[in-house]
């Protein structure tokens, strides 16, 4: 099986989490003692602008189509990683941080997920680049595409590249993980040489990326592979949030600032990390959006399994004080072999049936 053609759906999310958290640790350590104590003892106002120290992200404006009011101290974010070859986002993770409940939920969105747009290629991984190529804000383009899937605008968004992930992990000393079996694969055409022995060990940045890209030897295919990726992410998160100091911390922060396209301020990052540090490992959960593959417009797509997705959406991502319903979404799904839309309109519907 060709493991190079499709990179890990989660590998860049590792780097995003590590980079964001590292920057926050630096800020937290640099705060004057009195200011740090004040930030911990009083939750910031939900509508307050970012300030020095720590600051909760600004909540996205609640639209008329959303189901209710925002819950206090609950924030949503989009983390994405770039595919250097195609120029599109290769990894998309939508998350919810509940500061009061001390819980973080992260949902992987397949890169080929169909979005209800009039594009030639209607995949969510095109949204960031399509917006930038049109002279618009790439982050807003990605946020808008995700809105149709989720029914709300994410409060914050960050996009980075694969090389940054490798460098960040190396600067922080690697990630300890119990590799379940020997991983060996060679592909000169794609400059891949994976040789990771089984067992508990410290993986460097390159090895972390290779582990998440490896696709052989899984009895249940992608189901087992995604399970391994989630185990790895939990191990990385557990190690990271337990750290009091990190070698080369300033260099990692500099790398994050120079390499990540984000609308998060440094104070926002510090606030979100403080939320993460207060979570136990069991309170950081990873999921994959329920989906099914299908061809449309002569291309292979991933379509949302609507009912299962609504259940997961309300359990893991809903930032409101009432459930999100399908009337709040704008997604295309398959029902009885037919394409349907929750909004009642499929943009350029003839496209779906084009061979």
Label the model's feature ranges.
Residues 2, 15-16, 25-355:
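Non-catalytic, solvent-exposed segments at the cell envelope interface
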Residues 1-10:
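N-terminal Lys/Arg-rich, disordered targeting/topogenic segments
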Residues 9-21:
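Sec-dependent N-terminal signal peptides
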């Amino acid at each position: 099986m060709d493991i190079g053609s499709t990179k890990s759906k989660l590998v860049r999310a590792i780097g995003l989490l590590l980079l964001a958290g590292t920057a926050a640790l630096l800020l937290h350590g640099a705060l004057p003692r009195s200011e740090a104590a004040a930030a911990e003892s009083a939750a910031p106002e939900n509508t307050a602008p970012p300030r020095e120290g720590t600051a909760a992200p600004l909540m996205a404006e609640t639209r008329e189509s959303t189901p209710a009011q925002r819950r206090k101290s609950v924030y949503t974010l989009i983390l994405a990683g770039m595919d250097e070859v195609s120029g599109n986002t290769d990894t998309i993770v939508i998350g919810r941080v509940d500061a009061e409940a001390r819980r973080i939920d992260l949902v992987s969105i397949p890169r080929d997920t169909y979005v209800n747009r009039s594009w030639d290629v209607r995949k969510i991984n095109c949204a960031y680049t399509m917006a930038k190529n049109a002279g618009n804000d790439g982050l807003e383009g990605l946020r808008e595409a995700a809105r149709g899937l989720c029914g709300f605008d994410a409060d914050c968004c960050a996009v980075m590249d694969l090389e940054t992930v490798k460098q960040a992990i190396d600067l922080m000393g690697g990630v300890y993980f119990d590799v379940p079996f020997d991983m060996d694969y060679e592909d000169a055409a794609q400059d891949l040489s994976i040789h990771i022995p089984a067992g508990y060990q410290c993986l460097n940045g390159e090895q972390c990326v290779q582990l998440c890209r490896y696709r052989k030897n899984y009895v249940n295919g992608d189901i087992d592979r995604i399970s391994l990726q989630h185990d790895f992410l939990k191990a990385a998160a557990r190690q990271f949030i337990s750290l009091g100091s990190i070698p080369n911390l300033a260099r990692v922060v500099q790398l994050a600032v120079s390499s990540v396209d984000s609308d998060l301020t440094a104070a926002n990052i510090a606030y979100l990390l403080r939320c993460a540090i207060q979570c136990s490992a069991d309170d950081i959960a990873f999921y994959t959006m329920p989906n099914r593959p299908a061809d449309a417009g002569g291309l292979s797509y991933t379509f949302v399994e609507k009912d299962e997705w609504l259940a997961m959406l309300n359990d893991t991502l809903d930032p409101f004080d009432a459930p999100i319903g399908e009337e709040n979404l704008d997604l295309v799904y398959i029902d009885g072999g037919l394409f349907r839309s929750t909004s009642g309109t499929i943009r350029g519907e003839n496209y779906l049936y084009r061979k």
